[in-house]
Amino acid sequence: MERLSGKVILVWGFKRALLAILAGAIGVLALPPFGFFAAMFVSFTLLVWLLDGAAAGPDSGFLGRLWPAFTTGWLFGFGYFVAGLWWLGHALLIDADQFAWALPLAILGLPAFLAIFYGVAAVLARLLWSDGMGRIAALAFGFGLLEWLRSFLFTGFPWNAIGYGAMPIPLMMQSAHVIGVLGVTVLAVFVFAAPALLGTRQGRVPGIGLAVLIAAAHFAYGYYALNLPALPPAAGKAAPVVRIVQPAIDQEAKMDTAADRNAIFDKHLSLSVQPPVNGGKRPDIIVWPETAIPFILTDNQDALTRIADQLDDDQILITGAVRVEDMGPGVEPRYYNSVYVIDGRGQIIGASDKTHLVPFGEYVPFENILGYLGIENVVELPGGFSAAASRQLLTLPDGIKLYPLICYEIIFPNEMTPEIRQADAILNVTNDAWFGDTPGPYQHFLQARVRAVEQGLPLIRSANTGVSAYVDAHGRLISGIDFNEQGFVDSTLSGATVSRIDDSVRKTYFWLIIGIVGMIAVISRMGFISRVN
């Protein structure tokens, strides 16, 4: 290993850049649909050795000394995000005549921007760099801090945070309930980077030993949590049977204005009233995916009547739909990406609007500035939705409370409002047909499962196509429908975890972990400087 590390440290020029990109790309193999988490060990071991060799000339100024570390981290991030997000381009090819021009922005521009976070993470790590275990702690500190920033800066886009690579199965997800995905990220980077210590004799034993202890604790807590007794279904309330519908409608058909909207509506209704499989109990709650209603529901009384005709009086339909708010004479109405609750009489009895919109998909950020600069193509992207000021808990007639997250709202661990403490389950409606049968829908589903584990709540997830599923409070898949399959699954709503940890506690543990690895890095750095002097 010492010979290999020496070769990596000394590699230079084009080969060095290519190796950094390759190291980042290898890490994506740890994410869905592959789930080969061992790839992260290769990825981060190479990154440590590359940063070992990220040295500037003796005459370089302060910024000049940091530039090699930044470029190494940026190239690593570019490889990671291109390999992990290339599927975003699929959405632009659905209407290629209008949006193919934006393909390079999606598959190269966005990764180039996100890679800046990893470039800065590498700079922070290099400022605290030392030999031995200290540099492993410095890297964990840098990545942990920058993944936290990536979760909210510039509207936030925490997709594929490194911690997800350490959670391919429920056994390895349970730590997220205590320290969150960001806390897992910090510890995962330390463990993934620890094999780099095999390339040097300095700090090998304590560094590898600590990494083994962290990994052992991660697995041990997972085993412990999965064997805890479950709470009664839905906190002691009558446990309803939930039907999750996946219509698997091609995105081209949904976007075609000439498509038969009634046929789309009929498909949802037909799947909703099918008899239970194997003679099971009739569903009490039926869930349709994001924007399942192909028209403005409040303007279509006939649709509500048809829903009432198909549902029993005590059944509930929850569906994604576009909601329109009339702003008065002469003022453009506002459109919201929403979830409706409809009772068996066809009455809308509850609703919640999306609060975190997709930039350049549901709205155009800095629209006025872009228009002023003459960037017309960007300003003319589809969108036009308004963001709700707050998220509304959905309370059903039987007292069950659902916490609604529409589409990619579920990827934001730090945006759960206090109302989630009252919820019996997380409701996620989405439409991953935009991305085809690529890694995207599977990555999205993993993040949804981890939210369920973090919150200690079961997850009800309905996708137009993607992965529709019922997941228990420990992230275990109870029932599901694969990508591009049409159908439904019925599941009885289960309970939350025995002891739900509050988000504020998870955040405290995250900062405690950041502080500990930062302290290890600083102490090691001080010792390194004293030895050099």
UniProtKB/Swiss-Prot annotation:
<dbReference type="GO" id="GO:0005886">
    <property type="term" value="C:plasma membrane"/>
</dbReference>
<protein>
    <recommendedName>
        <fullName>Apolipoprotein N-acyltransferase</fullName>
        <ecNumber>2.3.1.269</ecNumber>
    </recommendedName>
</protein>
<keyword id="KW-0812">Transmembrane</keyword>
<feature type="active site">
    <location>
        <position position="354"/>
    </location>
</feature>
<feature type="transmembrane region" description="Helical">
    <location>
        <begin position="105"/>
        <end position="125"/>
    </location>
</feature>
<feature type="transmembrane region" description="Helical">
    <location>
        <begin position="74"/>
        <end position="94"/>
    </location>
</feature>
<keyword id="KW-1133">Transmembrane helix</keyword>
<feature type="active site" description="Proton acceptor">
    <location>
        <position position="290"/>
    </location>
</feature>
<feature type="transmembrane region" description="Helical">
    <location>
        <begin position="205"/>
        <end position="225"/>
    </location>
</feature>
<feature type="transmembrane region" description="Helical">
    <location>
        <begin position="509"/>
        <end position="529"/>
    </location>
</feature>
<feature type="domain" description="CN hydrolase">
    <location>
        <begin position="245"/>
        <end position="495"/>
    </location>
</feature>
<dbReference type="Pfam" id="PF00795">
    <property type="entry name" value="CN_hydrolase"/>
</dbReference>
<dbReference type="InterPro" id="IPR045378">
    <property type="entry name" value="LNT_N"/>
</dbReference>
<keyword id="KW-0472">Membrane</keyword>
<dbReference type="InterPro" id="IPR036526">
    <property type="entry name" value="C-N_Hydrolase_sf"/>
</dbReference>
<feature type="transmembrane region" description="Helical">
    <location>
        <begin position="17"/>
        <end position="37"/>
    </location>
</feature>
<dbReference type="InterPro" id="IPR004563">
    <property type="entry name" value="Apolipo_AcylTrfase"/>
</dbReference>
<comment type="similarity">
    <text>Belongs to the CN hydrolase family. Apolipoprotein N-acyltransferase subfamily.</text>
</comment>
<dbReference type="InterPro" id="IPR003010">
    <property type="entry name" value="C-N_Hydrolase"/>
</dbReference>
<keyword id="KW-1003">Cell membrane</keyword>
<keyword id="KW-0012">Acyltransferase</keyword>
<keyword id="KW-0997">Cell inner membrane</keyword>
<feature type="transmembrane region" description="Helical">
    <location>
        <begin position="127"/>
        <end position="147"/>
    </location>
</feature>
<dbReference type="Pfam" id="PF20154">
    <property type="entry name" value="LNT_N"/>
</dbReference>
<comment type="function">
    <text>Catalyzes the phospholipid dependent N-acylation of the N-terminal cysteine of apolipoprotein, the last step in lipoprotein maturation.</text>
</comment>
<comment type="pathway">
    <text>Protein modification; lipoprotein biosynthesis (N-acyl transfer).</text>
</comment>
<dbReference type="GO" id="GO:0042158">
    <property type="term" value="P:lipoprotein biosynthetic process"/>
</dbReference>
<feature type="transmembrane region" description="Helical">
    <location>
        <begin position="178"/>
        <end position="198"/>
    </location>
</feature>
<feature type="active site" description="Nucleophile">
    <location>
        <position position="407"/>
    </location>
</feature>
<dbReference type="GO" id="GO:0016410">
    <property type="term" value="F:N-acyltransferase activity"/>
</dbReference>
<keyword id="KW-0808">Transferase</keyword>
